[in-house]
Amino acid sequence: MTALTKLFHKLLLLEVFFMENKTQTSNHQHQSKWTLRNIILIALIAIFCGIIFWGIGFLYTALTVALTPIGAAPFANDILMGLWCMAGPLTGFLIRTAGSAFLGEFLGAAVEVFLGGQWGAGAFISGLVQGVGSELGFTLTGYKRYDWVSLNASILTTVIVTFAWDMYKNGYNKFALPLLIGLFVTRYISTFIFGGILTKMIVKLLDRSNAFSL
């Protein structure tokens, strides 16, 4: 993850090089208008996360194989869900514009598709569902604050929406209640770590390096 974070840092430095004017925002401000700078940054995040999504496919396969002998194969999906959903919170927290969390997640999934991800075009649907889940969290706070409150709201709505989708898509509705609870808690922890803690770490890294003014 360190190498990927450095890559993202370099991409942002390129973005800053081409965009001279910066807009200062605080933890409780948002940008109401779309700018070329926002679009470029979303594209960079989508590429960064799309590469991660593509790589997770291999990790998912290996983890599923490892967990199958102990009857815990379904947990592979939920253990890695936070990584699959990190583009939404990261984009929403950096761009701070309505719709940015959804676009970041969906476009990240699109990059995964074009890289030849193992789920093919089905990743578009997953990206759409995950994007909606992430966006809802920022909607609940009215796009008026960007701190742990909005980030946790995004994490919670992402977990709820994606879990509801998996009840239909992956047959979670056939699982026993104790297993469902275990999967839900696992998904929440994963999303909190990668969509919450890692997002804040990346934001702080960029803030310290002055690559992006927050």
Question: Where are the language model's segments positioned?
Answer:
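Short helix-perturbing small/polar motifs within transmembrane alpha-helices
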Residues: N21-T23, N38-A46, I125-D166
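Membrane-helix interface "capping/anchor" motifs
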Residues: G92-L103, L140-V149
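Alpha-helical transmembrane segments of multipass membrane proteins
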Residues: I45-F53, A87-G88, G108, E112, ...
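Hydrophobic transmembrane alpha-helices
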Residues: E15, E20-T91, K204
